[in-house]
């Protein structure tokens, strides 16, 4: 068995449930990336990208199953979320590197602030439109069932929170909490 095959097939059983090593490793890499980010270390970017790439394969389980019977579902919102985070991380890595080279030590790349009323008036309709389009896209790709709306919110909320982070909006933390309030029960179901 190759290392790649092992990575894609290995699981830990918890009673009648199982979790893939990819999901565990991807989650641990995400946590490691967050710690590196708090310490302002450049390693946050490649570690986070690697973790998101692994999690991308988890949520497109039917595509990356290598014939395993237990991975017949794709969660396009979750997979899209990880793809979005990969692209944003690449952008962040480039911006971080540019900012570090600009010769302005000690100055933040983004200054945190609350959104203005005008920004909220643009963001709220944009979120509704984004959610509606993502919902229709995931539905057209064959995603069905009760989790279609949940998966779409996870993707939409992640896009919104990530955009908010890039702009320095303080409210993005509230959006991350809302994503987690939906996403954590989703992960355990």
Where are these regions (language model features)?
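Individual alpha-helical transmembrane segments in multi-pass integral membrane proteins
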Residues: 67-93
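Polytopic alpha-helical membrane-helix bundles and their juxtamembrane interface segments
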Residues: 1-46, 50, 57, 67-70, ...
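A short structural micro-motif
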Residues: 53-56, 86
